[in-house]
Design a protein with these regions (language model features):
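Short loop/turn segments that connect beta-strands within beta-propeller blades
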Residues: 65-68, 99-102, 187-191, 238-241, ...
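Serine-hydrolase catalytic core recognition
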Residues: 153, 348-651
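Hydrophobic h-region of N-terminal signal peptides that target proteins for export
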Residues: 9-17
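Beta-strand C-termini and the immediately following turn/loop, strongest in propeller blades
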Residues: 52-59, 64, 86-100, 130-133, ...
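Non-catalytic accessory segments flanking enzyme active sites
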Residues: 39-44, 49-62, 70-79, 142-146, ...
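Beta-propeller domains
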Residues: 146-153, 161-293
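Predominantly five- to eight-bladed beta-propeller fold
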Residues: 32, 68, 107-132, 143-196, ...
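A short helix->beta-strand "capping" segment at the edge of beta-propeller domains
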Residues: 20-38, 190-198
């Protein structure tokens, strides 16, 4: 019956839209890459910074930046260089070195699989993306080494084997034993390894943001205690591994989170990023010989380093708006700042090697993509590419951007709102809140279609109001905004989301009797939190890969925001959803990948068990072969499942 009614509804919609523009299919919403704006990649020439290059098919085109004239067009030559010459690489759990002839030398030789060398550590927190760090002169290679002997294992079920089998992963749970990390340094000429003599804090410290000095003599490491409340920026001798000195320290009663390496201007000066001193992520200039740290970017906004020369530093800033990113320059001699990007929106830029030019790739709500080049003195700016709207053949609803005051009245939380096709303010429509809300995120930007997930438009085309809003705890509104969640994940986030829902439901066209919520990961945690704390508001929810109790989440992320059950028992009790299962009133579907190695299966299965104990009905759908994120054809199946659930119970 439901499918028959849906068919009738779709036929009616098709008649109503006789302009021949299409509706999204589920495959369009999930898999159609043609609905992403075309890109126009450019890069600055290494030989002549006044030239930019663009790959056009099988040729490289070179253009004069100022005139825009084509200077040359040459075939792309695909060489076959040996990738393993004069470099280190990983081999199983060890590091090896390949000399100029390609001969392989063992740097480490551990048979114990609990000791892993040359890979990222700390589960990729603190901006860590790799484990090998060659020195500028290539005479040394620093590398991470982690000992996971004491870390507990978690079993994942592999159904592809004949009788099923277990795959055990190392998973350091909150409050339990963590990995022990060291930094080794391989001396290429001597073919020897030394380890940095790190003695700060206990052995479960974090070693983050390794940076080489320009002269390759010193390694700088931002050493963080396990509680993540104190950081020491230390210098170590590359040859001996000996501790040299502590350059600076940071302390915070909530958390310190070093995420950025140092950027050296010369051997004596470097640029340093922190949000721990002035309430926002800002850039600072430290002079080693003087022991001084000077604030460079003096704005009440979060900034991010892009590049520098000896004369200037280039950075992104959110000072125009938290939902926009613009490129600025700052003179290192007189401190003068200049905005370089033009046009509203979200800008991603690169700087020429000599610092005279920049390339700008940006979009805004109704602008799919623009690529431009400009001069850093502000005198020149020229557009070189403008993309067409890839969705022009589809019947899209208008996307609205706006803001609602946070529950504490101090901030503007930004939202995107999508109303149904042929919207009539005198009708009532079901509402879906799509939520994430967790740290390091921003769901709403003034970029093309406001970072729309096409499934949202798919649902709007089928008669739903879709609402997405960022809350306290997310990015680009300063340290206080981001750290409001400390020791109580979910509290400030829910308060803000409810402030947004109060505003939304004040409109007569929003049906307060038909409100649903959907989210994944932290958004799954938020979905179940909202369903159980505000059952009178949310009638239907779909939660994916949800955190249920922070004691089952990983050490690095979980302890930063929640600390441990020992130090924060009240916070863990208040945020655990096990005790909230009895409050579930509406229809809830939980989906999760059965081999999820981020939010392990223990979370969602434990919540289902709590619902059984409480006598509360709940629906559950596992994806046996998927990890934390469900992709490809499995994602099409997932989002159809989500859609059907709302169609069945919220329509």
């Amino acid at each position: 019956m439901r499918k028959f009614l849906l068919l009738i509804a779709l036929l009616a919609v098709g008649i109503a839209h006789a302009d021949d523009r299409k509706l999204l299919t589920m495959e369009d919403a999930i898999l159609n890459l043609e609905l992403t704006p075309k890109n126009y990649d450019i890069r600055f020439s290494k030989k002549d910074p006044a030239i930019y290059e663009h790959a056009n098919g099988d040729v490289i085109e070179q253009y004069d930046i100022l005139s825009g004239e084509l200077v040359s067009s040459k075939p792309i030559l695909i060489g076959m260089p040996n990738p393993f010459r004069n470099k280190a690489s990983m081999k199983e759990n060890n590091v090896v070195w390949h000399d100029a002839e390609g001969k392989e030398y063992k740097v480490t030789d551990f048979a114990d699989k609990n000791i892993v060398c040359g890979q990222a550590v700390s589960r990729h927190e603190f901006g860590i993306s790799g484990g090998l760090f060659p020195s500028p002169d290539k005479a040394f290679v620093a590398f991470y080494q982690k000992d996971e002997t004491k870390v507990t294992t978690f079993p994942l079920l592999d159904i592809t084997t004949r009788t099923g089998s277990l795959v055990e992963i190392k998973y350091p749970m909150n409050g339990m034993a963590s990995e022990v990390v060291k930094v080794g340094v391989y001396n290429v000429a001597a073919q020897s390894v030394v380890y940095l003599n790190v003695t700060d804090f206990d052995e479960e410290r974090y070693l983050t943001n390794l940076t080489w000095s320009p002269d390759s003599r010193t390694i700088y490491v931002q050493v963080l205690n396990r509680a993540q409340k104190e950081m020491h920026l230390n210098a170590y001798c590359a040859k001996s591994g000996a501790f040299v000195k502590t350059i600076l320290t940071e302390q915070n009663s909530r958390w310190v989170e070093p995420q950025n390496p140092l950027h050296f201007i010369d051997n004596d000066r470097f640029i340093y990023t922190t949000d721990n001193r002035d309430g926002y992520k800002n850039l600072y200039l430290h002079t080693l010989s003087k022991g001084t740290t000077e604030r460079l970017t003096k704005v009440a906004a979060d900034v991010a380093y892009v590049a520098h020369t000896e004369e200037a530093v280039y950075y992104y800033s959110s000072e125009i708006s938290p939902v926009e990113q613009h490129l600025f320059s700052l003179s290192l001699s007189d401190g003068k700042m200049r905005q370089l990007t033009r046009g509203e929106g979200w800008h991603n830029c690169q700087i020429s090697p000599d610092g005279k030019y920049f390339a700008d790739n940006y979009s805004s709500l109704n602008v799919p993509r623009v690529v431009a080049v400009g001069s850093t003195d502000g005198k020149f700016y020229r557009e070189v590419f403008r993309a067409e709207d890839p969705s022009k053949d589809f019947n899209y609803s208008t996307i609205e951007l706006g803001s609602v005051k946070s529950a504490d009245g101090k901030y503007n939380n930004h939202y995107r709102l999508i109303k149904p096709l042929d919207f009539d303010e005198n009708k009532k429509y079901p509402v879906i809140l799509y939520v994430y809300g967790g740290p390091h995120s921003q769901m709403v930007r003034n970029s093309f279609q406001a970072q729309l997930r096409r499934w949202e438009m798919y649902m709007a085309q089928r008669g739903y109001v879709v609402f997405v809003m960022d809350n306290r705890g997310t990015l680009y509104q300063g340290a206080e905004y981001e750290k409001a969640i400390h020791r109580q994940c979910g509290k400030a986030e829910m308060e803000d989301q409810m402030a947004g829902m109060k505003w939304l439901l004040s409109h007569k066209w929003a049906d307060s009797e038909r409100v649903g919520v959907h989210g994944w990961s932290y958004g799954g945690f938020m979905t179940i939190s909202l369903m159980t704390h505000y059952p009178e508001v949310f009638k239907v929810g779909v939660a994916g890969g949800p955190v249920i109790d922070w004691k089952w989440y990983e050490v690095m992320y979980g302890e930063r925001y929640m600390e441990t059950e020992t130090t924060n028992p009240e916070g863990f009790a208040a945020t655990s959803l096990i005790a909230q299962a009895k409050n579930l009133k509406g229809k809830l579907l939980i989906c999760q990948g059965a081999i999820d190695d981020v939010v392990v299966w223990q979370h969602s299965l434990s919540f289902v068990d709590a619902c059984i104990v409480a006598g509360v009905p709940v629906d559950y759908f596992p994806y046996p072969r998927t990890q934390h994120n469900v992709r490809g054809k499995w994602r099409v199946h997932l989002m159809q499942k989500v859609t059907d659930y709302f169609e069945d119970y919220l329509r």
